[in-house]
Amino acid sequence: MIALIQRVSEAAVKVDGEVTGEINQGLLILLGVEREDDEAKAKRLMERVLTYRVFEDQDGKMNLNVQQVNGSVLVVSQFTLPADTKKGTRPGFSKGAHPVDAERLYDYFSDLCEEKLHTQRGRFAADMKVSLVNDGPVTFWLQV
């Protein structure tokens, strides 16, 4: 399971022109589910993301996590993250989870986040328009 996290001052996702989720300070989490992923991996990744120290303390060092700054998360499914890009000029998607499994684990991950802090979501498998202001920019690839 892969999370591409971006520290944002604001982020929003729209489906068919309607806002389905938006946050101010926090993390935009683009979530990719791989074939071998399960609930244990989803929980481990959620714990890692929510405790990953990407926010600055009073000394300007990245020592605080999203929970410590009372931030929010916006979770957006991103089936392209597990793509195989090693050869050619077209990505392969055989490493991605089956859509039914991917949706179940996306929902599970998002539900776990909701238990910890303010969480907004995109809509699984929808054509989404994601807007954000990346603060930094600060972006990290986390994988379990």
Curated annotation (Swiss-Prot):
GO terms for molecular function: D-tyrosyl-tRNA(Tyr) deacylase activity; Gly-tRNA(Ala) deacylase activity; Ser(Gly)-tRNA(Ala) hydrolase activity; tRNA binding. Its EC number is 3.1.1.96. Gene3D superfamilies: D-tyrosyl-tRNA(Tyr) deacylase. GO terms for biological process: D-amino acid catabolic process. A motif (Gly-cisPro motif, important for rejection of L-amino acids) lies at residues 136-137. An aminoacyl-tRNA editing enzyme that deacylates mischarged D-aminoacyl-tRNAs. Also deacylates mischarged glycyl-tRNA(Ala), protecting cells against glycine mischarging by AlaRS. Acts via tRNA-based rather than protein-based catalysis; rejects L-amino acids rather than detecting D-amino acids in the active site. By recycling D-aminoacyl-tRNA to D-amino acids and free tRNA molecules, this enzyme counteracts the toxicity associated with the formation of D-aminoacyl-tRNA entities in vivo and helps enforce protein L-homochirality. A Gly-cisPro motif from one monomer fits into the active site of the other monomer to allow specific chiral rejection of L-amino acids. This is D-aminoacyl-tRNA deacylase. It comes from Aliivibrio fischeri (strain ATCC 700601 / ES114). The gene is dtd.
